[in-house]
Amino acid sequence: MIDLAVVIAHTADLCRKPYQHAVIPIHEDEGTSSIDDLFVRIETRDASGSRMEDMDLELEIYRSGSDVNLMLSWCDQAERPMLWQGQHPVWMHGDNGMRCTAPADGQPLEAMARRLRAQLVSQSRLD
C-alpha cells in the first residue's frame, strides 16, 4: 500500500516548482490511506519555508465505478475555477460548476492532476 500523502505532496512538488507541499486531511478523523474517498488540503510553502496560503489547494479523490476521479481547487477562493480530472481535464467555474476555459496559471494544476491520477490508476490495478 502506498502512502497517499507522500505521493500527493511529491507530485505537487514536481509540478508546482519551486514550491514545497504538505498534505493535511480536511477531516481530522480521516487518514490518507484510501483513494476511494479522500479529501485533503495541500499546503504550499516557498523555498524559504514561508507559507503561501493563497497557493493552497483542496484535492478530492473518489471512485466512480472502477474509475478514479480528482477535483482540484484553490482553497477558500470560490471565484477561481476548479479542475475535474477523469479521462480528460475539465475546468469549471467554482461558483456554479459550469464549464470554463483553463485559467492562465492552470497548467501546473493540470499536470499535477494528470500525473497523480495516472499514479493512482496504476496503483489501484496492483491492489
What is each model feature region?
Residues 1-58:
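Negatively charged, low-complexity tracts enriched in Asp/Glu with abundant Ser/Thr
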Residues 4, 14, 38, 57-59, ...:
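Generic detector of leucine side chains in alpha-helical contexts
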Residues 5, 9-12, 22, 47, ...:
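A sequence-composition feature that detects small, non-aromatic residues
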Residues 16, 41, 45, 51, ...:
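Arginine residue identity/basic-tract feature
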Residues 21-25, 29, 69-71, 94, ...:
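Generic marker of "main functional regions" within proteins
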Residues 33-34, 48-50, 64-66, 73, ...:
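Generic serine detector
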Residues 58-104:
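Intrinsically disordered, low-complexity regulatory segments enriched in Ser/Thr/Pro
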Residues 88-127:
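Ampiphathic alpha-helical segments that act as solvent-exposed interaction surfaces
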